[in-house]
């Protein structure tokens, strides 16, 4: 199975493309085109035009979680699509999400649009904590259990409930997996619940062990180096062949992973275009 991945929004960019804090990837596999996240709001549409991509040809949208840097482009994307489209996500994407940024202890970080507005533009939300099959071999992995003893959710992320700021458990965090004949290809949003936990869930959902590639955010930028080391060790033990880091991985963690994985590591930026399997 050939898989094509076009990165439309990411923190850094290839020459001539627009970068912004966030993530958006167009994934083409098994006869379907799926837009995975929409970035902060500007880059995805801008870069899609540069690539000559007609977003009206997209079959479905998958939202990895409810943070604004993954959902901020939804309005513009739906306006460009000009049709009814299924959006697959966890119900908690609508939670009141906040983050602690610098001296601001209550910075709103959630989905920036009302559901009614998005539905008026053609969105049909399929909200579930369970895996969703886009095809038999291309699916979302559902809610991710916290299995490892070292992967923790960022303590600077919160959910407002009944007027109180509580730690956000990020139950809405999800990923996609493609069951290719050369191994699993896992598409990550932020991996807030841990990249190893995420890959284990992808294995469980598919019943397959071999992981060909994991591409996307790993949320290691705020993690201690000890976690980087344990993550790298587990990735090797799991036999992950390629690792494409994006977004919330952070430069220092990405540099560490590049040292650990050598030629099997790559950065996935705005303007990147990949065809799998790699040759």
Model-based region annotation:
Residues 6, 88, 124-128, 139-141, ...:
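General small-molecule cofactor/ligand-binding pocket signal
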Residues 67-70, 86, 166-270:
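Cap/insert and terminal regions of metallo-dependent hydrolase folds
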Residues 92-121:
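Active-site neighborhood of divalent metal-dependent phosphoester bond hydrolases
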Residues 43-94, 206-213:
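Active-site metal-binding motif and surrounding structural segment of the metallo-beta-lactamase
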Residues 3-51, 169-188:
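Conserved beta-strand hairpin/beta-sheet module of binuclear metal-dependent hydrolase folds
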Residues 10-12, 38-41, 66, 91-93, ...:
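Active-site metal-binding loops of divalent metal-dependent hydrolases
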Residues 104-112, 130-182:
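Active-site-proximal loop/helix segment associated with metal-binding centers of metalloenzymes
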Residues 117-125, 179, 238:
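A structural motif corresponding to the C-terminal end of an alpha-helix
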């Amino acid at each position: 199975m050939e898989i094509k991945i076009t990165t439309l929004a990411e923190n850094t960019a290839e020459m001539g493309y627009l970068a912004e804090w966030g993530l958006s990837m167009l994934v083409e596999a098994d006869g379907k085109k799926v837009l995975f996240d929409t970035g902060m709001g500007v880059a995805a549409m801008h870069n899609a035009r540069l690539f000559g991509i007609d977003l009206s040809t997209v079959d479905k949208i998958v939202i990895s979680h409810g943070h604004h840097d993954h959902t901020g482009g939804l309005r513009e994307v739906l306006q460009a699509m000009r049709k009814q489209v299924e959006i697959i996500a966890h119900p908690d994407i609508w939670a009141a999400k906040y983050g602690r940024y610098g001296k601001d202890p209550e910075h709103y970080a959630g989905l920036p649009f009302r559901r009614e507005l998005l539905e008026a533009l053609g969105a049909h939300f399929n909200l579930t904590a369970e895996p969703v099959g886009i095809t038999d071999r291309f699916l979302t992995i559902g809610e991710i259990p916290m299995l490892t003893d070292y992967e923790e959710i960022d303590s600077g992320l919160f959910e407002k409930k009944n007027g109180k700021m509580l730690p956000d458990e990020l139950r809405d965090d999800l990923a996609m997996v493609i069951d290719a004949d050369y191994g699993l290809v896992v598409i990550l949003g932020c991996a807030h619940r841990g990249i190893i936990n995420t890959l284990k869930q992808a294995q469980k959902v598919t019943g397959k062990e071999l992981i060909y590639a994991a591409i996307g955010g790993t949320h290691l930028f705020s993690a201690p180096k000890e976690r980087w080391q344990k993550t790298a060790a587990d990735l090797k033990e799991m036999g992950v062949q390629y690792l494409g880091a994006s977004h919330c991985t952070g430069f220092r963690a990405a540099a560490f992973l590049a040292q650990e994985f050598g030629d099997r590591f790559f950065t996935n930026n705005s303007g990147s275009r990949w065809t799998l399997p790699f040759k």
